[in-house]
Regions:
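A short, structured active-site edge motif that brings together acidic residues
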Residues: 176-187
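Short, positively charged low-complexity motifs
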Residues: 6-12, 19-21
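Conserved non-catalytic scaffold segment of RNase H-like nuclease domains
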Residues: 48, 53-178, 192-213
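Acidic donor-binding loop at a coil-to-helix junction in glycosyltransferase catalytic cores
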Residues: 217
Length: 219
């Protein structure tokens, strides 16, 4: 979980953060804290968040206290959220009582993994041959994600959509997180220089990323 969270917090505390970025973050704050009211418009939001400086990480921890907060990442057979399948799933974080959660598993997609996908994440047909398919982890995954705060680099437009397709394929409704925070959306809205992939962002902000393109490492 720390990688995606650290990317957000380090971006937020840089001196040249833009008003657009501040508005985006304030919206996330509002979604986590329903009784928050914006009273002074954009200027008030900007000044308030800038005044927090490096204390924003402490504030974020306070806002999320009592929530199940999970970094989420998938490795898949491809990039289609409708037809491709999960080959690895990771959910890392804390429960509402601050107990650690580390759920990481390989998944048999019941289809050949294309070589192009294997070249990216290093998972081959032989690695998943003895694993269960998604139906064997569907219930546990649902219980973890439903009602949780989910953080991932492209979680809203890719991971959650592809996960939803797996559930619909089984004839089940997918879990509904309380909120999904996609770090990719944050960096794009802040107009941070490309590249926007997680590895490049971690390098830019001095965050160690080992075993990139495994679900647990990316989460």
């Amino acid at each position: 979980m720390r990688l995606n969270v650290e990317v957000v917090l380090l971006i937020l505390t840089t001196p040249n953060i833009t008003p657009t970025g501040l508005v985006l973050v304030s919206n996330a704050v509002v979604s986590w804290c329903g009784n928050f009211r914006i009273r002074n418009g954009l200027c008030g939001i900007r000044n308030w968040l800038r005044s927090l400086g490096n204390r924003f990480d402490i504030m974020a921890q306070d806002l999320l206290r009592g929530e199940r907060v999970l970094a989420f990442d998938l490795e898949t057979t491809g990039i289609s959220t409708n037809s491709d399948r999960i080959v690895q799933l990771a959910l890392l974080g804390v429960d509402s009582n601050e107990a650690p959660i580390h759920f990481e598993t390989l998944v048999n997609p019941r289809m050949p993994i294309p070589y192009g996908a294997s070249d990216v994440h290093g998972i081959y047909d032989a690695d998943v041959r003895g694993q269960g398919d998604f139906s064997t982890i569907a219930d546990e995954t649902f219980e973890l994600i439903d009602g949780a705060v989910i953080i991932g680099h492209n979680a809203r437009n890719f991971d959650m959509k592809l996960l939803g397709s797996e559930y619909l394929r089984m004839g089940k409704l997918p879990p509904k997180p309380k909120v999904v925070l996609a770090t990719l959306e944050v960096v794009r809205r802040l107009k941070i220089a490309r590249p926007h992939n997680l590895g490049a962002l971690c390098k830019r902000y001095g965050i160690s990323l080992e075993n990139a393109h495994t679900a647990a490492a990316d989460a």
